[in-house]
């Protein structure tokens, strides 16, 4: 069947169809989620400059041939999941292959890309029991990481035949036959040079020749359909600086570092500690860049020097309110998850830790995942969607779910969006949960993304407010020793508190009323979105109604345990 007309092919349109052959018109630029899901199609021909939604052809178990065009812009999450008759996938030029983009296909043996790849995510190959080789014949501009593949027991070869600009690939868990990647071209920057060897320059001008090729390739990509995928030279500049520094070309390294600083594409704390830049550390050019860089991104310095709050300035008389454990939805959550069994015995703090630990181990953190399509934004529906789709949630989703679990247990809780000063250009915010402990008479910091709480030097658990004040005042802080990301990467207080959270505690935003489904559409009656701002930053608009009154923003929960007033 040939489909006629329209730029967007709607979600689910031919899901479950009995069609044997499917050709999309060249005018189609987007195929939405599950468009051909679980159909009987055997052959699909795709149009140029294509963007796909997730699971476009998932569970098409009779599919044996996919005709890819000259240029595919994006091939996203689980697009071919469960297509068990496919043995070979052969792309031409492709802008983006997403996380688990090629996954759960029993017969797939070979993935080959003949042209240019703008970006591949980490773990783009996942659970492919017959996969033996992944071949990139052309240039690969950037990769995610750390895994090139996961749970592909027969995978023995990953080869990069062209230039690789920037790679964060470092392992292949569940792929025992693959020890490292093969390279035939220049690898400008590799985060793990044992797994993906990087270049060394001869020092006779070949650095300038390579740099001309890099500039040409990036400009060429930006003029074509992949521009939004690869980014500009400014986006790549910092890691190119690292690559040329390690290769011994100081002049080119400093040019790229200056470009990164000028466009705010690097962080002070990282630059001064990054051993990749050691070869240029003592140059005049490097030292001249540091003052500007510190004003941009020394996050402890910025937080320490920000204006104070103005306690008592909020006069509207409103209070923060919380769903009661006796509410029907909260009762259902408590029973559905068997929260009393998860929480166990001991103090309320002991129970809070166990509930967070259970959530952390049950739903993984996926920073690019967002909320599942079609799922209501409440703990039960989000949990069921994650289990069914074998997916995780981003920090907002996890903090939202944890807040509901806590309220179902009778503990007032909010999730709080923590944002940087440069929130309008830095989209890397973080969302955590605050929960009221009756035994301690205070709010506590709980972060399900990293299974983390924060203490003072005596082991006393702290609130978000206390952590922020201690960072500003230089007082000691600690995190629990088992804090981690997805039970893979251990967290340290230096990275988590003094870099990541110091950046993200400039603005703080939360809902006036906390309940299930509070983000499942427009704000509910009686709810507002409130942002706590340092004095003088009014009008920055990180979200919602603004206040400088930290006493009001962090008001005790005991006064408002009976729902909305």
Report each predicted region and the residues it spans:
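Low-complexity, Gly/Ser/Thr/Pro-rich intrinsically disordered linker/tail segments
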Residues: 472-565
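Structural signature of tandem-repeat unit edges
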Residues: 1-8, 17-30, 39-51, 61-74, ...
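Secondary-structure boundary elements
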Residues: 306-393
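Hydrophobic/aromatic-rich core segments of domains that either
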Residues: 400-475
């Amino acid at each position: 069947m040939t489909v006629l007309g329209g730029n967007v092919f709607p979600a689910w349109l031919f899901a479950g169809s009995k069609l044997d052959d499917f050709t999309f018109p060249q005018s189609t630029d987007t195929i939405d989620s599950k468009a051909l899901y679980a159909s009987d199609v055997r052959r699909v021909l795709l149009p140029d400059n294509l963007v796909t939604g997730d699971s476009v052809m998932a569970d098409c178990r009779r599919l044996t041939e996919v005709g890819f065009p000259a240029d595919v812009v994006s091939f996203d999450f689980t697009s071919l999941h469960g297509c068990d008759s496919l043995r070979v996938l052969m792309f031409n030029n492709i802008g983006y292959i997403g996380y688990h983009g090629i996954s759960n296909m029993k017969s797939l043996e070979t993935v080959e890309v003949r042209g240019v790849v703008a970006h591949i995510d980490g773990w783009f190959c996942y659970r492919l029991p017959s996969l033996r080789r992944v071949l990139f014949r052309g240039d690969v501009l950037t990769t995610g990481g750390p895994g090139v593949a996961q749970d592909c027991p027969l995978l023995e070869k990953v080869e990069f035949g062209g230039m690789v600009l920037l790679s964060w690939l470092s392992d292949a868990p569940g792929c025992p036959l693959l020890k490292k990647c093969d390279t035939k071209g220049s690898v400008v920057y590799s985060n793990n040079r044992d797994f993906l060897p990087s270049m060394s320059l001869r020092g006779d001008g070949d650095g300038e020749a390579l740099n001309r090729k890099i500039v040409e390739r990036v400009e060429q990509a930006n003029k074509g359909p992949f521009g939004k995928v690869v980014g500009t030279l400014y986006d790549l500049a910092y890691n190119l600086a690292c690559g040329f520094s390690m290769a011994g070309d100081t002049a080119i390294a400093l040019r790229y570092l200056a470009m990164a600083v000028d466009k705010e594409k690097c962080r002070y704390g990282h630059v001064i500690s990054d051993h990749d830049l050691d070869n240029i550390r003592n140059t005049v050019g490097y030292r001249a860049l540091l003052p500007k860089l510190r004003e941009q991104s020394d996050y402890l310095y910025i937080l320490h020097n920000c204006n104070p709050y103005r306690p008592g300035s909020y006069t509207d008389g409103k209070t923060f309110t919380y769903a009661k454990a006796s509410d029907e939805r909260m009762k259902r959550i408590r029973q559905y998850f068997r929260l009393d069994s998860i929480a166990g015995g001991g103090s309320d703090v002991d129970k809070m830790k166990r509930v967070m630990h259970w959530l952390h181990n049950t739903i993984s953190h996926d920073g690019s995942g967002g909320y599942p399509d079609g799922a209501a934004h409440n703990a039960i529906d989000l949990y069921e969607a994650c289990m069914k789709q074998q997916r995780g949630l981003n920090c907002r989703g996890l903090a939202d779910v944890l807040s509901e679990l806590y309220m179902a247990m009778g503990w007032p809780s909010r999730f709080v969006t923590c944002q940087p000063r440069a929130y309008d250009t830095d989209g890397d915010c973080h969302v955590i949960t605050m929960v009221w402990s009756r035994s301690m008479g205070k709010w506590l910091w709980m972060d399900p993304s990293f299974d983390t709480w924060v203490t003072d030097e005596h082991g006393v658990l702290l609130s978000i407010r206390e952590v922020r004040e201690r960072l500003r005042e230089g007082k000691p802080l600690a995190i629990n020793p088992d804090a981690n990301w997805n039970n893979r990467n251990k967290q340290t207080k230096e990275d988590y508190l003094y870099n990541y959270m110091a950046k993200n505690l400039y603005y703080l935003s939360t809902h006036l009323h906390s309940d299930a489904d509070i983000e499942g559409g427009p704000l509910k009656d009686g709810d507002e979105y409130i942002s706590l701002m340092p004095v003088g930053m009014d009008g920055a608009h990180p979200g919602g109604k603004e206040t400088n009154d930290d006493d009001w923003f962090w008001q005790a929960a005991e006064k408002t345990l009976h729902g909305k007033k």
